[in-house]
Amino acid sequence: MRVFMTGAGGGMGFESFKAMLPDLGKLYDLVLLLRDSEKNRKLFAPYMDTKGLTIHWGDLLNREDVADCVQGADIVLHIAAFVSPQADYFPRKAMANNYGSTRNLIEAIQSLDQGDSTRFVYIGTVAETGDRMPPIHWGRVGDPIKPSMFDYYAVSKVAAERYVIESGLTYWVSLRQTGIIGPAMAKIRDPIQFHNCLDNVLEYASDRDSGRLMRNLCAYEAEGTLDPSFWGHVYNIGGGESCRVDTYTMYKIMYGEIGIKNIDYVIDPKVNATRNFHGQYYLDSDKLENYLHFRSDSMQYFYDAYLKELGPAKPFGRIICKLPGGQKLMGAIIKSTFNKLLESEHGPRYWLKNNMEDHMPTGAVARPGRPFPRKPAKWTTSPIGTRWCPWTTATTKPSPRASSTGPIWPGLPNSGAESSSPRP
């Protein structure tokens, strides 16, 4: 069997590549289309002589490069994407890459008369469903597609996913990726961290589990054990209950690891969005797990990666926080590192200073006269901060309601024609 994978030089792609290595030359051969960059050349130098591996140096927007790789492929794993936060800075590039590459791949499959044989695996995103703040933070495939304002990445992925679904391919699937925890997330230093609301929730998945997901899909298909009913659907990728967390709790644990027990020393609600991001807990992420059995990690994997990224700052911070007034001092040091981000192009303070009125309704800036209230100085004493717990700390899937007239799940509307059991 022949597998063609895009995006192997990225986070999820490289983890998938590493997970697939033991199978190469045995269960299937692997073809990669990689951008010819110094980074990719260095990253894949140790694997150039791997049995069952073929590397094409080229561009997904070049139709000839794409056709060369698609020809004879039994499975196409389209993992490559121009993602946030980079997509926020270059929205046209996001659309050209994310939609354009998907279209090129599908057109190549069809032009090679492989539309009835090639399995096409598209990686979508949780951002497609946009803002799902409590109390509508439990979601499922089939919920409204509504990217948040200014989320050009999400718009490009919606367009690409629709193209896949309407392509006419016999075997396709869209797997909507969530926030990916791991070393890469621990390294993020970008204003996007202030776009995430403190009472927002996400059901994350680890980079390693995401790689295992791709490997298992290919292995099961090669072995003939993947249920044919898997194809022709959209699924949510999620790590399950152990990977569900709200933003505030995540920060509380992260900073608690270095000794800061009072999160108000670090978190300033005035610089975090109150809406217009994305995220939800999934009612249906177990479906994909039941097919592909990929879950292994929990949120602790991310906290460990964060502490490793801190390096020498971790023991230093713990020592400081044990001293009188140390927690407050350490909090001030951490806050000072945020200032440059807040005042950069996509930072809330930048929007405020430059009177970017179109960004104000997103809730990312506290300002008098706007259609949302002035934000409190402390999260733990704010109206939201004191009432959010029952919603977001409950990470166990809610039980279906017995009523056939009310919502089946909290925060989700009933069509009026459904029974009391959740949709399949």
Regions picked out by a protein language model, each given a short descriptive name:
Residues 1-23:
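N-terminal Rossmann NAD(P)H-binding glycine-rich loop of SDR-like oxidoreductase domains
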Residues 49-97:
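NAD(P)H-binding glycine-rich loop region in Rossmannoid oxidoreductase-like domains
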Residues 61, 93-104, 147, 151, ...:
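Glycine-rich NAD(P)-binding loop of the Rossmann-fold in SDR/ketoreductase-type enzymes
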Residues 82, 103-150, 173:
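Conserved Rossmann-fold NAD(P)-dependent oxidoreductase catalytic core, especially the SDR/UDP-sugar
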Residues 158-183, 229:
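Conserved beta-loop-beta element that borders a ligand/cofactor-binding pocket
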Residues 196-223, 233:
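Substrate-positioning beta->alpha
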Residues 217-291, 297-305, 310-323, 327-386:
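Mid/C-terminal beta-alpha module of Rossmann-like enzyme folds, strongest
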